[in-house]
């Protein structure tokens, strides 16, 4: 047993113990992080009604764009960080993490500026109707100021987990989310601020989470940072982007699909008994429900990522196989539990996000049951897609991400909407989910056969 293995439990500790220690805090952190927008939408829905829900749905692509870039930087940097540690390249690990911090701040400032300069054209592009635009402008115009801090919260969190401090990363997000949960009702109802109150509550909470995460920099256990590490190294940016490309494509593709969905719901909803605003509002509510599922599965993946990256880098291939086997079993169990809840209580879940008329609830239940129908296999698709960048195969992961969102879901949505109107949109999701599952599982089985089942000595 070499010195590195003695120092790093990722190479020697039981896989089940490691996954439990790493994944549970990551799941909690992700679910809590998802609550930033969900709590806003719940309180806005209760205070303003379903038009408020529609407004946050229209503004949500801004959040998913930030998540796409933040996760690309964070997951890409964390993957490279663990691969470097597995190869005993501590200096490179430091430089990658330092570059990631500078990149997150820079990207956050750029996105904030673009949103503030082009707010209304962006919201119109995202599918806003005349009734929704005013609410959405109020919300997004304020939350734009929190974007740099949100980027840090999203992107630096995986690096803290990569250092083995999953609990700290979880607590940093929980602090912000709990603060948001307290400030939301205080600002919306107590100070009678409405949607602007929810927006300011989100910004303040994001600032606090970012500060807590940045305070961890001098506490890293696996490396000791130097001031010179915190600069933009374009060679490191390239590596970070390549390993984080799958996460970026997954999120940005979801953003494109969401924008297309909003516009299709606006167009074909207007031709139905529901009108445009109800389908857009319901689409936002159901997507927020689905975000909880995504948060759980991505948390599992993020918990496994350091284990996979370190052991693949150290050529301990048997541990890679063992980790993936356990990860997929846990994913299927959790996905099935959530699927049962989603399908059994769609009305109650819709009602959590505010009141509406009979047509609103009718469309909400139909849409939720169909959209979430294949939740029990969606988890496996996500885990398989994000496995490949964790072991350095970024291109394959990127291709699989693109396949689900851009090559399957988007064409199916357009085809069914033009053929069957808003009813066609309801069934586009489950059809695409099943096709994507078959593709991803086939590729995964083929690729896993190429990874040795025995370890190699790392010289």
Regions found by a protein language model. Name each.
Residues 1-23, 81-148, 190-245, 308-373, ...:
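Short alpha-helical transmembrane segments in multi-pass integral membrane proteins
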Residues 16-35, 39, 62-69, 145, ...:
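Residue-level signal for short hydrophobic patches within transmembrane helices
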Residues 21-40, 142, 176, 205-209, ...:
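Transmembrane helical elements of multi-pass membrane transporters/channels
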Residues 35-53, 123-130, 186-193, 255-285, ...:
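Helix-terminus/linker motif at the lipid-water interface of multi-pass membrane proteins
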Residues 50-61, 136, 140, 199, ...:
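Small-residue hotspots at the loop-to-helix junctions and early N-terminal turns
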Residues 53-113, 150-169, 282-340, 344-346, ...:
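Small-residue-rich hydrophobic transmembrane alpha-helices
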Residues 65, 180-184, 210-214, 292, ...:
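Hydrophobic transmembrane alpha-helices of multi-pass small-molecule transporters
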Residues 74, 143-161, 169-177, 198-213, ...:
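Short runs within selected transmembrane alpha-helices of multi-pass transporters and secretion channels
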């Amino acid at each position: 047993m070499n010195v590195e293995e003695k120092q790093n439990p990722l190479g020697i500790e039981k896989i089940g113990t490691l996954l439990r220690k790493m994944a549970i805090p990551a799941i909690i952190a992700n679910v809590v992080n998802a609550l930033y927008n969900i709590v806003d939408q719940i309180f806005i829905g209760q205070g303003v009604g379903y038009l408020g829900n529609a407004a946050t749905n229209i503004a949500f692509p801004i959040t998913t764009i930030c998540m796409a870039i933040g996760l690309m930087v964070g997951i890409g940097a964390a993957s490279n960080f663990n691969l470097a540690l597995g190869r005993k390249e501590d200096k490179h690990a430091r430089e990658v993490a330092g570059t990631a911090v500078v990149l997150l701040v820079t990207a956050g400032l750029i996105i904030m500026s673009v949103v503030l300069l082009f707010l209304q054209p962006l919201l119109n592009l995202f599918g806003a109707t005349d009734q929704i635009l005013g609410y959405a402008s109020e919300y997004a115009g304020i939350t734009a100021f929190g974007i740099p801090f949100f980027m840090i919260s999203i992107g630096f969190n995986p690096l803290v987990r990569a250092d083995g401090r999953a609990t700290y990363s979880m607590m940093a997000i929980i602090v912000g989310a709990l603060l948001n949960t307290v400030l939301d009702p205080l600002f919306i109802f107590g100070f009678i601020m409405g949607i602007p109150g929810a927006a300011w509550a989100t910004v303040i909470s994001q600032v606090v989470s970012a500060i807590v995460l940045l305070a961890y920099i001098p506490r890293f256990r696996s490396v000791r940072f130097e001031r010179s590490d915190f600069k933009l190294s374009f060679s490191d940016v390239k590596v970070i982007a390549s390993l984080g490309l799958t996460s970026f494509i997954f999120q940005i593709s979801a953003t494109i699909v969401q924008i297309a969905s909003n516009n299709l719901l606006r167009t074909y909803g207007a031709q139905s008994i529901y009108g445009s605003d109800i389908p857009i509002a319901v689409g936002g509510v159901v997507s927020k429900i689905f975000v909880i599922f995504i948060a759980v599965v991505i948390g599992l993946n993020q918990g496994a990522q350091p284990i996979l990256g370190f052991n693949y880098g150290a050529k301990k291939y048997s541990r890679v196989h063992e980790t993936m086997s356990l990860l997929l079993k846990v994913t299927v169990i959790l996905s099935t539990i959530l699927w049962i809840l989603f399908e059994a209580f769609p009305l109650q879940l819709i009602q959590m996000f505010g009141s509406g008329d009979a047509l609103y609830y009718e469309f909400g239940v139909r849409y939720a049951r169909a959209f979430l129908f294949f939740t029990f296999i969606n988890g496996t698709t996500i885990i398989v897609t994000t496995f490949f960048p964790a072991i350095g195969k970024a291109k394959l992961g990127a291709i699989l991400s693109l396949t689900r969102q851009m090559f399957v879901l988007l064409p199916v949505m357009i085809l069914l909407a033009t053929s069957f109107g808003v009813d066609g949109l309801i069934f586009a999701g489950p059809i695409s989910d099943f096709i994507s599952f078959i593709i991803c599982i086939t590729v995964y089985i083929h690729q896993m056969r190429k990874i040795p089942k025995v370890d190699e000595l790392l010289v």
